[in-house]
């Protein structure tokens, strides 16, 4: 197997023009989102032009989690009901689903893991903000949870044999993290963060993705959201939500996760409780039915 450093991998992908470009609808939506004078109708118009996304927006707006007095029948009403933050989350989820695929990864398990992590990150952010007076934006935490594993799919997509060897030698996800560093001299967190930087996604999301395995290595300003994302990923493993290339074992708790919990005197049981709440929210939102 060829040993590659993270910088070499990114350089090679760029040279071969293989780094995925930001999906068109997501690009339009993010550009409109950054406009301080953005209007909900402008965002609704962007969504409506994409059949796949607009259908999912409608489905989610009429789901158990969001359904109000009656069924919404138009995209404008659906976006109004969901709000622009929830709409943005769905645009990201659907756009990225078509971008991040690999024959080495079970797509259904991968996206179930990612969406559950997104809802878990939101829950954990709210909890940490309340307990420790942190100021993690729950919406940014949701996106970080959704995107945290994207680098793994890039590795599996563009370096199939290398990824397969790492996976074969890893019975747990902790082992996978160790092996990708030892054998590839890089990790999926760095690769995913680099891609999202090229897409000009929010800086705090990029930092959260980059540091979701080692939050303490991230600048102090972004430690809280990186830590939240770290726990969100760990929460998924606690409730059996594997990531599509390493199976979850609810009877085995990651030593790395236990160490992270200890940093702020959190307990495994409470994290599992938040994870179950997040899992219930993800199921009632209808987002899991997207994939």
Predicted regions and their residues:
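Helix-termination/interfacial motifs at the ends of transmembrane alpha-helices
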Residues: 163-167
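Conserved alpha-helical "signature site"
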Residues: 1-161, 171, 175-178, 183-251, ...
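Terminal helices and disordered tails flanking the catalytic cores of nucleotide-processing hydrolases
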Residues: 1-11, 254-291
């Amino acid at each position: 197997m060829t040993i590659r450093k993270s910088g070499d991998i990114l350089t090679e992908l760029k040279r071969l023009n293989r780094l995925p470009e930001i999906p068109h609808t997501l690009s339009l939506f993010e550009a409109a989102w950054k406009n301080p004078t953005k209007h909900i109708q402008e965002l609704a118009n962007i969504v409506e032009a994409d059949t796949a996304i607009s259908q999912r927006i409608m489905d989610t707006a009429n789901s158990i989690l969001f359904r109000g007095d009656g069924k919404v029948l138009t995209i404008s009403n659906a976006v109004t009901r969901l709000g622009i933050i929830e709409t943005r989350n769905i645009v990201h989820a659907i756009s990225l689903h078509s971008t991040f695929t690999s024959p080495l990864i079970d797509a259904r398990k991968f996206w179930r893991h990612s969406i559950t992590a997104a809802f878990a990150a939101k829950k954990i952010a709210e909890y940490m903000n309340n307990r420790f007076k942190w100021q993690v934006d729950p919406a940014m935490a949701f996106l970080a949870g959704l995107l945290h594993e994207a680098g793994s799919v890039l590795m599996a997509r563009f370096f199939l044999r290398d990824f397969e060897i790492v996976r074969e030698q890893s019975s747990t996800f902790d082992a996978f993290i160790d092996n990708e560093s030892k054998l590839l001299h890089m990790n999926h967190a760095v690769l995913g963060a680099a891609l999202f930087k090229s897409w000009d996604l929010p800086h705090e999301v990029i930092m959260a993705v980059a540091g979701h395995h080692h939050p303490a290595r991230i600048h102090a300003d972004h430690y809280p959201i990186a830590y939240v994302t770290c726990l969100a990923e760990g929460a998924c493993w606690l409730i059996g939500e594997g990531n599509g290339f390493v199976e979850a074992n609810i009877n085995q708790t990651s030593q790395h996760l236990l160490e992270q919990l200890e940093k702020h005197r959190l307990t495994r049981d409470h994290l599992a409780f938040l994870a179950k709440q997040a899992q219930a929210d993800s199921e009632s939102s209808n987002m899991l039915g997207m994939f």
